[in-house]
């Protein structure tokens, strides 16, 4: 062993750990000194206003207390937080700063948190159900001390079973050639070829083997098989992982195989299903359990006698007896522990739980033959050295393409602390020590292909059983547009759904994306997908809180977490909200590629990504994700979900050719495969953009595509000139004929209908979309002289603004475009089409008549009877552009109220809800028709900030009954004290007289 190599490695690791420790301590100190309790809660390290919901005695006399948020509604959930099972927490009274007790968090759900307190707290801890408490995550000194001790042991390690392994792991020597092993008889007969090869490889290696398991490839199944085969060969196995959850997962799997297993660790940190395998539980069932209990009872009795006697000689005798009893107790307990450890085939613990200051110190140094470290890529390298020093061979399993070890210090992470042992060894030794699992059993082919190409060099494939499965294949789920696509991109670019810019907060939120998530989940649930099969993943705690406020009451089974909370998990459908939407193009820690990989690969059948492509495309990796979804999935704009959004490029300025924001290069329309083509397998979408995968090269199960627009002139955004020319030729034939109406089939996609709308406007024809869902179709007809839906081409000179027609009524949407000029109907046309569809539906409901063409005719007749005031321009052709500009300027400087023509140049206000200007007498939202939107906005703001503003209503001052009763008791107690003081003073006066 090269001592210089070991010393330099240990020195570097100790320095990095010191940086991490200092950063953690400084962070905690800064939080407590400069952050309010509410800010601590927003950071996820504190839970406020908790009430005791239940108390019970847990395993081995521990006191388990369950806390819940104070209930002000039917269903209250905990705010988004970073608490996990096993964390050390401090308990505080809400009205005091002193710490009441320290406990271990055993379980946390969306509605409650359970903490285990030791027996020592039973006498001092008196929790009142009517009081409120808070929990604060505390720094764990034990872990840091154990990591430091392991590195110092490595530095002093000269001879022992792990000497050769240490040289290989630190690069002083190379791994030995693999051994020849006989053919294996596998316990699990369903293993695929790559899994069997990985098992054989791990057993044949003499010192080091690495099992690389991408998402869904059955890594844990392979690790369990390796452990079983090692036990079959008579080897003693120490199995570790960085987290309690990962260890318990292995315990559950091994317990099914009827092997003798022993789980080390605090019982409060273990899952209830594995607690009977813990060391404490095994000791309680051992032969020495009764003897140990008798010795403890004798010690208690001698203590009692010692307190009662006053004789010094007797006290001395009692102390000597207690000393002897304690010595016997220690010997008996150690003998029982050694017996339990040696009787086990597999000993399991966390990396730090395998330290030498625990039960393993009772075993010989060379007791274990092999160490298995699962989820090694998530562990700090220093923590892996705790178990690695106990055996001559190690098997590492994990995926260094997923989440790295969690660190606080950015400086330490950049210096190498976030680089795992597995990642370092895989890069150094390559295929000589690594075997990759290549068949995944989780994801649809389209989902898998992106992860395979982006992160794993295209090396793993889908098993046929999952390659084509979709949500619609689940029992009770109907075939809808949402359940038949594996990939869905909902693009918010140009829709004005910007992220929240919270001051003094590092967290981000996006209420617009929350609304989109809510609508998409409702569509999935309506189709029959169970809420428990859906996961919503957000990168920021603030967004998680907003999502829970919107969804948890209606869908309590729905899981809403950050990316870190879903590592190793899977769901049938996953919705990703990227949150970031800003004009600077900042993506924050979305730039961490491995986090995105984890988020996408949690899904089995359906992934929906909600993002602003204009923002996220500033990061190369995210751009590849958007491009892949665009090419192989379905792309929709946010306007297909939200009717009341005014896009950023849909402004008065934009109509003058001076858009306030650059035109997004993301797709703005949804391109879907019609139902008839879905059944026949025919493709109706446009050809892909140059440089992308062609339709024939698409993976199985991939869906239709939409292309980015590289032009800004509103041309066809999906390529597809053949389809456009086909529609143009059809309309030209109709114009040349004597027919009055042309109907297009229902098989047209929404984007095809958009093309027809554009062409109809260009030819000056009337165009209406009627019907719902698959029955929706578009009808093109000739304009009647009285029709004023949009301006037809006019050979004569354009009319002046003074001669323009009166503005149509607000409830009669009118598409105003420039004839024979480049039209930009993208999002605006789609929005107007949706409005027309809604009004048509309302007219059918009111009159009980089919929509068809009756609505435009009645609108025209109604307009003849009563023409409201308000100038509107008939847009001229490009020959007289000055008239167009003057008309638009005049309209922009006139009150937008339907019966008002007062100028707003001097006295006017802009409405944030409808993006129009109004005179002062009409600017209130309740007057011009935005009352509901204003109230909704106020409610949302109050809910988010927790502050009542002037005009937002009166605060409910009614006290909670429990709180009122508590205050009443305090008042009665105080009055009693004052009354007794008055009585005593009165008696003193009487005595004085």
Curated annotation (Swiss-Prot):
Primary enzyme class: hydrolase
Residues annotated for Zn(2+) binding in this entry: 911, 914, 928, 930
Cellular component terms (Gene Ontology): axon; cytoplasm; growth cone; neuronal cell body; nucleus; perinuclear region of cytoplasm; ribonucleoprotein complex
An example Gene Ontology biological process: negative regulation of transcription by RNA polymerase II
InterPro entries according to UniProt: AAA+_ATPase, AN1-like_Znf, Coronavir_polyprotein_1ab, DNA2/NAM7-like_C, DNA2/NAM7_AAA_11, Helicase_ATP-bd, P-loop_NTPase, R3H_dom
One GO molecular-function entry: identical protein binding
Region (Disordered), start-end ranges: 650-723, 765-815, 837-872, 953-993
Segments of skewed composition (Polar residues): 667-683, 703-716, 837-847
Motif (Nuclear localization signal): 862-866
Its EC number(s): 3.6.4.12, 3.6.4.13
Alphabetical list of SUPFAM superfamilies matching this protein: AN1-like Zinc finger (SSF118310), P-loop containing nucleoside triphosphate hydrolases (SSF52540), R3H domain (SSF82708)
Entry binding sites for ATP: 213-220, 402, 441, 570
UniProt modified residues of type N-acetylalanine: 2
Domain R3H: residue ranges: 721-784
Region of interest: SS DNA-binding: 637-783
AN1-type zinc finger segments: 889-938
Quaternary state and interactors: Homooligomer. Interacts with RUVBL1. Interacts with RUVBL2. Interacts with GTF3C1. Interacts with ABT1. Interacts with ribosomes.
Domain comment (free text): The R3H domain recognizes phosphorylated 5'-ends of single-stranded nucleic acids which promotes binding of nucleic acids and stimulates ATPase activity.
Family listed: Belongs to the DNA2/NAM7 helicase family.
Protein name stated in the entry: DNA-binding protein SMUBP-2
Native source organism of the sequence: Mus musculus
Gene name linked to the record: Ighmbp2
């Amino acid at each position: 062993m090269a001592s210089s190599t070991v010393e330099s490695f240990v020195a570097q690791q100790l320095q990095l750990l010191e940086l991490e420790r200092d950063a953690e301590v400084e962070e905690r100190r800064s939080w407590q000194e400069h952050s309010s309790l509410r800010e601590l809660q927003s950071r996820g390290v504190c839970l406020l206003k908790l009430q005791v919901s239940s108390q019970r005695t847990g395993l081995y006399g521990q006191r388990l207390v369950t806390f819940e948020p104070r209930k002000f509604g039917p269903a209250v959930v905990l705010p988004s937080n970073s608490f996990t099972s096993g964390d050390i927490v401090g308990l505080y009274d809400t009205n005091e700063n002193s710490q009441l007790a320290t406990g271990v968090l055993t379980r946390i759900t969306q509605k409650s948190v359970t903490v285990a307190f030791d027996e020592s707290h039973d006498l001092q801890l008196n929790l009142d159900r009517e009081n409120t408490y808070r929990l604060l995550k505390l720094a764990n000194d034990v872990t840091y001390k154990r990591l430091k001790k392991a590195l110092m042991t490595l530095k002093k390690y000269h001879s022992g079973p792990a000497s050769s392994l240490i040289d290989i792991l630190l690069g002083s020597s190379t791994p030995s050639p693999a051994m020849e092993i006989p053919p294996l008889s596998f316990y699990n007969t369903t293993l695929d070829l790559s899994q069997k090869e990985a098992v054989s490889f791990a057993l044949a290696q003499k010192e080091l083997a690495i099992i690389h398991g991408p998402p869904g490839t059955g890594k844990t199944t392979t690790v369990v098989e390796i452990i079983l085969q090692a036990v079959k060969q008579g080897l003693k196995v120490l199995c570790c992982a960085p987290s309690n959850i990962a260890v318990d997962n292995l315990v559950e799997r091994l317990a099914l195989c009827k092997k003798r297993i022993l789980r080390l660790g605090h019982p409060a940190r273990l899952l209830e299903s594995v607690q009977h395998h813990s060391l404490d539980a095994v000791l309680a069932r051992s032969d020495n359990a009764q003897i140990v209990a008798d010795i403890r009872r004798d010690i208690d009795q001698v203590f009692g006698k010692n307190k009662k006697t006053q004789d010094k000689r007797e006290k001395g005798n009692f102390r000597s007896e207690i000393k002897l009893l304690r010595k016997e107790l220690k010997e008996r307990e150690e003998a029982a522990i050694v017996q339990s450890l040696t009787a086990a085939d597999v000993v399991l613990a966390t990396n730090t739980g395998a330290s030498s200051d625990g039960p393993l110190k009772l075993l010989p140094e060379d007791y274990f033959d092999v160490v298995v470290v699962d989820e090694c890529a998530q562990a700090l390298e220093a923590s892996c050295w705790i178990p690695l020093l106990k055996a001559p061979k190690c098997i590492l399993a994990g995926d260094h393409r997923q989440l790295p070890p969690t660190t606080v210090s950015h400086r330490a992470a950049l210096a190498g602390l976030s680089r795992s042992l597995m990642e370092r060894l895989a890069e150094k030794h390559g295929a000589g020590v690594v075997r990759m699992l290549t068949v995944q059993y989780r994801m649809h082919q389209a989902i898998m292909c992106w992860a395979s190409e982006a992160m794993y060099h295209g090396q793993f494939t889908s098993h046929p059983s999952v390659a084509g499965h979709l949500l619609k294949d689940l029992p009770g789920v109907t075939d809808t547009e949402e359940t038949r696509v594996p990939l869905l991109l909902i693009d918010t670019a140009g829709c004005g759904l910007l992220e929240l810019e919270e001051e003094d907060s590092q967290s981000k939120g996006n209420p617009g994306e929350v609304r989109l998530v809510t609508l998409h989940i409702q569509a999935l649930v309506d189709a029959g997908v169970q809420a428990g099969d859906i996961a919503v993943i957000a990168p920021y705690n603030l967004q998680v809180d907003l999502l829970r406020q919107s969804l948890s009451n209606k869908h309590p089974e729905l899981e809403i977490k950050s990316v870190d909370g879903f590592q190793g998990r899977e769901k049938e459908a996953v919705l990703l909200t990227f949150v970031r939407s800003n004009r600077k193009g900042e993506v924050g820690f979305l730039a961490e590629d491995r986090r995105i990989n984890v988020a996408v690969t949690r899904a089995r059948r359906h992934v929906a990504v909600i993002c602003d492509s204009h923002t996220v495309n500033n990061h190369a990796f995210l751009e590849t994700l958007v491009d892949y979804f665009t090419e192989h999935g379905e792309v929709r704009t946010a306007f297909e979900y939200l009717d009341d959004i005014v896009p950023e490029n849909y402004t008065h300025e934009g109509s003058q050719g001076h858009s306030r924001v650059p035109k997004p290069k993301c797709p703005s329309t949804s391109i879907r495969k019609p139902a008839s083509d879905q059944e026949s397998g025919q493709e109706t979408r446009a050809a892909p953009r140059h440089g992308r995968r062609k339709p024939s090269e698409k993976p199985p199960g991939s869906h239709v595509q939409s292309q980015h627009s590289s032009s800004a002139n509103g041309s066809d955004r999906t390529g597809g000139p053949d389809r456009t020319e086909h529609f143009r030729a059809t309309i030209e034939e109709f114009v040349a004929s004597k027919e009055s109406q042309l109907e297009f089939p229902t098989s047209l996609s929404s984007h095809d209908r958009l093309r027809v709308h554009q062409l109809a406007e260009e030819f000056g024809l009337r165009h209406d979309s009627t019907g719902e869902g698959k029955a929706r179709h578009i009808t093109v007809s000739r304009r009647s002289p009285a029709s004023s839906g949009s301006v037809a081409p006019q050979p004569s000179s354009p009319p002046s603004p003074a001669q323009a027609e009166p503005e149509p009524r607000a409830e009669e949407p009118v598409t105003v475009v420039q004839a024979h000029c480049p039209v930009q109907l993208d999002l605006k046309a789609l929005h107007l089409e949706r409005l027309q569809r809604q009004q048509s539906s309302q007219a059918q409901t009111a009159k009980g008549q089919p929509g068809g063409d009756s609505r435009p005719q009645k609108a025209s007749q109604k307009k003849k009877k009563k023409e409201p005031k308000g100038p509107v321009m008939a847009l001229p052709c490009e020959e007289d552009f000055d008239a167009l500009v003057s008309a638009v300027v005049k309209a922009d400087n006139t009150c937008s109220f339907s019966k008002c023509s007062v100028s707003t140049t001097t006295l006017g206000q802009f409405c944030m809800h409808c993006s129009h200007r109004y005179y002062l007498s009409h600017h209130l939202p309740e007057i011009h028709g935005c009352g509901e939107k204003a109230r909704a906005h106020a409610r949302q703001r109050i809910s988010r900030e927790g502050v009542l503003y002037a005009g937002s209503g009166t605060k409910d001052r009614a006290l909670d009954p429990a709180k009122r009763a508590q205050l009443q008791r305090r008042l009665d107690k105080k009055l009693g004290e004052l009354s007794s003081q008055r009585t005593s003073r009165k008696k003193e006066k009487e005595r004085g007289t």
